């Protein structure tokens, strides 16, 4: 019985890791596609992970901004933190920063698209993207 429970737990854990790995692969592809398709301005960095427009595009493709409600955006960003950041301390920091940025940027009366861009810019400025698995792969 104990070995059955252990096997079941390990199988569930493996499925969770596989799902997160698949989501990371999709995010990587979206970032690469957005970096190729979006025009790069002269003053923008060469690294696509340092470009707000690329992050906004990739996160929009993954559905983070589908629902303009701040609570829905926070929930989706928190899922992103759990997938893209591996260190538990950095995951908590990512969740706090994204929550703060969503609160700050949704107070303004701007279009939903501009709010989404501003949220991505706020998170990028805070350094959260530097703690992601994607940044360590460079």
Curated annotation (Swiss-Prot):
InterPro entries assigned to the protein according to its UniProt record, in alphabetical order: Ant_venom_allergen_Sol_i_2, Ant_venon_allerg_soli_2/4_sf, Sol_i_2/4
Keywords associated with the record: Allergen, Disulfide bond, Secreted, Signal
Localization per record: Secreted
Tissue distribution: Expressed by the venom gland.
Pfam families: Sol_i_2 (PF22750)
Signal peptide, first to last residue: 1-19
Keyword Secreted attached: yes
Coiled coil: none
GO cellular component, as recorded: extracellular region
Bridged cysteine pairs (disulfide): none
Protein family: Belongs to the ant venom allergen 2/4 family.
Subunit structure: Homodimer; disulfide-linked.
Protein name as catalogued: Venom allergen 2
Record organism: Solenopsis saevissima
């Amino acid at each position: 019985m104990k070995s059955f429970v252990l096997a079941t737990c390990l199988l569930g854990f493996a499925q969770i890791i596989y799902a997160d790995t698949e989501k990371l692969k999709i995010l990587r592809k979206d970032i690469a596609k957005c970096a190729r398709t979006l025009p790069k301005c002269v003053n923008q960095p060469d690294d696509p992970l340092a470009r707000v427009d690329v992050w906004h595009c990739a996160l929009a493709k993954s559905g983070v901004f589908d629902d303009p409600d701040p609570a829905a955006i926070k929930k989706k960003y928190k899922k992103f933190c759990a997938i893209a950041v591996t260190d538990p301390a950095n995951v908590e920091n990512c969740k706090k920063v994204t929550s703060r940025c969503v609160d700050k940027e949704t107070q303004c009366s701007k279009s939903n698209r501009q709010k989404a861009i501003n949220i991505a810019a706020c998170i990028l400025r805070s350094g959260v993207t530097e703690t992601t698995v994607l940044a360590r792969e460079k």
